[in-house]
Each structure stands twice: as structure tokens, then as C-alpha cells.
């Protein structure tokens, strides 16, 4: 039978008060560890899983209007979506995100990179979401090879090292790393899969969004290929890595780097410098995460254009809102956004929810 570590035995043999403190610390650490495991078991599993059962594997494609070639403006770049888990069954919000981007950017390639997709010439999984998104001629579903993505970047050694250890927020941290690597290597536009795109984003270059007066957010990024700002983000990711603090490698990283980039101490001091611009919250985060329930409240349809006149895309805060049910035909804000900006997904929701 193995013996307890000597240090632990010495601590337990100490004075009663010391023993109480020791046991309290051990109990706290154990409780903290278990809490994290339970949290990720609950949050990490999609709460809408029940909505995806008994759905058909395929859906008839709608009649789509051929895109009108752009007459002016910058050369269109790629639009990227990422799925860094092994899931290959997009939920309805995921479908709406990609569809809305495809409809507002008919001239661009919309690339959905999914870690769970097989490589080579393997066929795509049979699933309603895959079938629906494949209807759009400018959407491509591609396998995500993280090792290849991080190759020849400062993130390569970090990724190799993190493979051998457990961290509480590894999945979102992988997503944080992947998006800045994508922007560095390829440029274009990155969007989280809980956005609904309202307008064409082609005129936004070297831009990111402000979440609040104190922090930026990387759920939307638009950068030129090999921009130095993204290079600094990758270096900061490795140099100041802490996978145990939520957001440290994502929003907080972008905020840190932007402050260094502009030599400022507060975001209020500058919205743009050295060719990088931050847009105000209403551009991409018109409803703060604390008020996410507003997406499920009824709204007068006539008010929608006025409320979102300064908004390019709406972030729905899926981490908070996932699993919240709503009627697809209701006057809820989210239902109206689906109906207007991702009508094919909306029709599927009306049929199968």
C-alpha cells in the first residue's frame, strides 16, 4: 500500500489549528477541481442536443438568387468559421451564422473549418446542418488540422506542449489560438459561430470590436495577411500564457496587445492607431452579455432597423444563451433575426423544432 507524501504527514501531525487549516486547503482545492469538471461537463455539452435528435440527414436546397459580382470595393477575402471540438453536427445558431455570412458576402469564400471532419477524399457526415450549409455555393466545409495551422508560428511549440496536459479551458483557448493564427497566415475575416451577420463586412480591414469600455473581443476579426498586430498577438499568447484564467488568452490578450500597440493605458484613450481600428460595442456587440435574455424578448418588427442601424453583425452570446428555447415564428428578437438574415435555417427551424 502506498504511503502518503511525507510533507502531508508532517502537516497532519501538526497542531490542531494547523491541521484544520491544512484540511481546509486540501478540501478547497479538491472542491475547486470537481467544480471545474462539473462546469465543463454542463457547459461543454451542447444544451440544444435534444433539438438535433430525429432530424433528417438531408434537406432540399432552396432556390438561390445568383450573386451579383461586386462593381467596386476591395478584393474580397475569405470568411472563416471554426469548430475546434470534434463536433460535426452544427446547431441552428451555427447554421444561421454561416448562412447569414454567405448571403451577405456572395462574392467571398465562406470556409467552415471543423476539427472533427475527416481529411482526404472522405465524404462529409450526413447531418441536417452539413446538408443545409452545402446548399450555398460559396460555403466550403473543410477539415481543421491544428498542427498544420500552427506550423511555422510561435504557437507550434505551445500546441505540442499542451497536448500532454489537462487544462480547464483548453477548448476555448484552442479557438483563441486558431483564430489569430488564421488571420496571420491567411488574412480575411473571422467570425464566431454565434454571430448573425447583417451587413457586408468587405470594407473592414485591420479591425476588431469593442465589447465594453474595458475590453476588446476577438469573436470578430478582420485583418490583412501577416499583419504585425496578429504577430504580436501570437507572441503574447505564448509569452504570457495562462490557461487557468477565463478569457486571458482571448479578449484580455487582444486588449493587452492593443494597449501596447497604441502605447495607451485605457481603451478610452484611442480607438485607432498605427493602422488598427476598434469599433464601438454597437458594431458587433449591441447587447452586452449581461443582457443576453433580451434576444428572447418580443420586439416590434418596425423597430428592428432602427435598433440595429449601426450594427454589422449581432453576437448572441451562445455561452449564456445556449439551450434557451424560443418559437421560430414568434416576435422574439432572435426569431426575427433568423427570419430576416438566415431564412433557409429559419424554415428548417419552423419545420423541425
From Swiss-Prot:
Membrane topology (UniProt): Single-pass type II membrane protein
Lumenal side: 44-353
Transmembrane segments: 23-43
Catalytic class of the enzyme: transferase
Topological domain ranges for the Cytoplasmic compartment: 1-22
Listed pathway(s): Glycolipid biosynthesis
Chief place where the protein resides: Golgi
Documented effect of changing residue 187 to D: In p individuals; partial loss of activity
Subcellular location field: Golgi apparatus membrane
Ranges spanned by the short sequence motif DXD motif, renumbered to the chain: 192-194
The protein's Enzyme Commission number: 2.4.1.228
Tissues with expression: Ubiquitous. Highly expressed in kidney, heart, spleen, liver, testis and placenta.
UniProt-listed Pfam families: Gb3_synth, Gly_transf_sug
Keywords: Glycoprotein, Glycosyltransferase, Golgi apparatus, Lipid biosynthesis, Lipid metabolism, Membrane, Signal-anchor, Transferase, Transmembrane, Transmembrane helix
Glycosylation (residues): 121, 203
One cellular component (GO) term of this entry: Golgi membrane
GO molecular function: galactosyltransferase activity; lactosylceramide 4-alpha-galactosyltransferase activity; toxic substance binding
Entry-linked InterPro entries: A1-4-GlycosylTfrase_dom, Glycosyltransf_32, GlycoTrfase_DXD_sugar-bd_CS, Nucleotide-diphossugar_trans
Gene3D superfamilies to which the protein is assigned, alphabetical: 3.90.550.20
Similarity annotation: Belongs to the glycosyltransferase 32 family.
Its job: Catalyzes the transfer of galactose from UDP-alpha-D-galactose to lactosylceramide/beta-D-galactosyl-(1->4)-beta-D-glucosyl-(1<->1)-ceramide(d18:1(4E)) to produce globotriaosylceramide/globoside Gb3Cer (d18:1(4E)). Also able to transfer galactose to galactosylceramide/beta-D-Gal-(1<->1')-Cer. Globoside Gb3Cer is a glycosphingolipid of the globo serie, one of the major types of neutral root structures of glycosphingolipids, that constitute a significant portion of mammalian cell membranes. (Microbial infection) Globotriaosylceramide is one of the cellular ligands for bacterial verotoxins.
Record remark on domains: The conserved DXD motif is involved in enzyme activity.
UniProt-recorded name of the protein: Lactosylceramide 4-alpha-galactosyltransferase
Native source species: Homo sapiens
Amino acid at each position: 500500500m502506498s504511503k502518503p507524501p511525507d510533507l502531508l504527514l508532517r502537516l497532519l501531525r501538526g497542531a490542531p489549528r494547523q491541521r484544520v487549516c491544512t484540511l481546509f486547503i486540501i478540501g478547497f482545492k479538491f472542491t475547486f477541481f470537481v467544480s471545474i469538471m462539473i462546469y465543463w461537463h454542463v457547459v461543454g455539452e451542447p444544451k440544444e442536443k435534444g433539438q438535433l435528435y430525429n432530424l433528417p440527414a438531408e434537406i432540399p436546397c432552396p432556390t438561390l438568387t445568383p450573386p451579383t459580382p461586386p462593381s467596386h470595393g476591395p478584393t474580397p477575402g475569405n470568411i472563416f468559421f471554426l469548430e475546434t471540438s470534434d463536433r460535426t453536427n452544427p446547431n441552428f445558431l451555427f447554421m444561421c451564422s454561416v448562412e447569414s455570412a454567405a448571403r451577405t458576402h456572395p462574392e467571398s469564400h465562406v470556409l467552415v473549418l471543423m476539427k472533427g471532419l475527416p481529411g482526404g477524399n472522405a465524404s462529409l457526415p450526413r447531418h441536417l446542418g452539413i446538408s443545409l450549409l452545402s446548399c450555398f455555393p460559396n460555403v466550403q466545409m473543410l477539415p481543421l488540422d491544428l498542427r498544420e495551422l500552427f506550423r511555422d508560428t510561435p504557437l507550434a511549440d505551445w500546441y505540442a506542449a499542451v497536448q500532454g496536459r489537462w487544462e480547464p479551458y483548453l477548448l476555448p483557448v484552442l479557438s483563441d489560438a486558431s483564430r489569430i493564427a488564421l488571420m496571420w497566415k491567411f488574412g480575411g475575416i473571422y467570425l464566431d459561430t454565434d454571430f448573425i451577420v447583417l451587413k457586408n463586412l468587405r470594407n473592414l480591414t485591420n479591425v476588431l470590436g469593442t465589447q465594453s469600455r474595458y475590453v476588446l473581443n476577438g469573436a470578430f476579426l478582420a485583418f490583412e495577411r501577416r499583419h504585425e498586430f496578429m504577430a504580436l498577438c501570437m507572441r503574447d499568447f505564448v509569452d504570457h500564457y495562462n490557461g487557468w484564467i477565463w478569457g486571458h488568452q482571448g479578449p484580455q490578450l487582444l486588449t493587452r496587445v492593443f494597449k501596447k500597440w497604441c502605447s495607451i493605458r485605457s481603451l478610452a484613450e484611442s480607438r485607432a492607431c498605427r493602422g488598427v481600428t476598434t469599433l464601438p460595442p454597437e458594431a458587433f456587440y449591441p447587447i452586452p452579455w449581461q443582457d443576453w435574455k433580451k434576444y428572447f424578448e418580443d420586439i416590434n418588427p418596425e423597430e428592428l432597423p432602427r435598433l440595429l442601424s449601426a450594427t454589422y453583425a449581432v453576437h448572441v452570446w451562445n455561452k449564456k444563451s445556449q439551450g434557451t428555447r424560443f418559437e421560430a415564428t414568434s416576435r422574439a428578437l432572435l426569431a426575427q433575426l433568423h427570419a430576416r438574415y438566415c431564412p433557409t435555417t429559419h424554415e428548417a427551424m419552423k419545420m423541425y423544432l
